[in-house]
Regions:
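Charged, glycine-rich intrinsically disordered N-terminal tails and low-complexity linkers that flank
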Residues: 1-66, 201-203
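Context-gated lysine
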Residues: 15, 27, 114, 126-131, ...
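Generic structural marker for isolated residues within well-ordered, non-membrane alpha-helices
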Residues: 41, 72, 138
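Extended, charge-rich alpha-helical segments
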Residues: 53-56, 70, 111-114
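Acidic-basic catalytic patches of nuclease active cores, encompassing PD-(D/E)XK
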Residues: 61-83
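Nucleic-acid nuclease catalytic cores
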Residues: 79-101, 105-188, 192-194
Length: 203
C-alpha cells in the first residue's frame, strides 16, 4: 500500500496513528492538554462520517513531502542499507492503532525521515537527538512492526553538502512502548464511549 494514496487514507480513517501519539499523550499540570481532546474530536468525526477532513498543508509541508525520496536515497548511499517502502501497519493487539514508517530497513530496522525548516535541522544536528514527538512516533512504529531500531534522518538540501544530512539510530524502548500502549488504549476506550454516548443522545 503506497502512502498518501486513497487506499492509505482509507486504512488510517478513525485510527490513532504514530504521528499523532504525541497528541494522545500531551499533558499539562492540570491534566490532559487541549491537543488530546482536539485529536479525539477529529477521530470521532472520521468514524461517524467515514470521511477525513483535509488537513492543513503549506509550502513548507509540501516541500518536506517532495524531499523525502531524496533523503531516502541519501540514506541508502550513506549506509548501504536496503529500504522497502510500506503502508499502514496495524498494531498487533490494539485495534484502531497503527503506524506508517517511511521505510523498512533490512530485517530488524526502520527509517523515519524529516525534512524540516533549516533552523530545526541545525538544532537537531546540535542536540544530536530528535524531538520527543518524533521519539514517540518511532517507538510506536517499532511497537506496530515488531522492529528493533529506527534510523532518524533529518535532511535539508539548502545547506552545504556536509550539513544537509543527519542520521541517528533510536533503539527500541519497551518501557516507553508499554506507556504508549497504555495511553493509547485508554484514549481509544474514551473515544468509543463518547461515540456510544452520542448515539444514545441522538436516538
Amino acid at each position: 500500500m503506497e502512502q498518501r494514496t486513497e487506499e492509505w487514507f482509507a486504512a488510517r480513517l478513525g485510527k490513532v496513528t504514530a504521528s499523532c501519539v504525541a497528541d494522545v499523550m500531551a499533558k499539562t499540570r492540570s491534566g490532559h492538554a487541549a491537543s488530546r481532546q482536539n485529536y479525539m474530536a477529529e477521530l470521532i468525526c472520521q468514524r461517524l462520517t467515514g470521511m477525513q477532513e483535509t488537513r492543513f498543508s503549506n509550502a513548507a509541508m509540501q516541500r518536506g513531502t517532495d524531499l523525502e525520496p531524496h533523503a531516502r536515497a541519501r540514506y541508502i548511499i550513506e549506509t548501504g542499507e536496503i529500504v522497502t517502502e510500506t503502508g499502514l501497519v496495524d498494531h498487533p493487539t490494539i485495534a484502531g492503532f497503527g503506524a506508517s514508517p517511511d521505510g523498512l530497513v533490512g530485517d530488524t530496522g526502520l527509517i523515519e525521515i524529516k525534512c524540516p525548516n533549516t533552523w530545526t535541522h541545525l538544532e537537531t544536528i546540535k542536540t544530536g537527538k530528535p524531538k520527543r514527538e518524533y521519539l514517540l512516533q518511532m517507538q510506536t512504529q517499532m511497537a506496530c512492526t515488531g522492529r528493533q531500531w529506527c534510523d532518524f534522518v533529518s535532511y535539508d538540501d539548502r545547506l552545504p553538502d556536509d550539513m544537509q544530512y543527519f542520521c541517528t539510530r533510536i533503539e527500541r524502548d519497551d518501557a516507553l512502548i508499554a506507556e504508549i500502549e497504555s495511553e493509547v488504549s485508554a484514549f481509544l476506550s474514551e473515544l468509543e464511549a463518547e461515540i456510544e454516548y452520542l448515539k444514545r443522545k441522538a436516538a
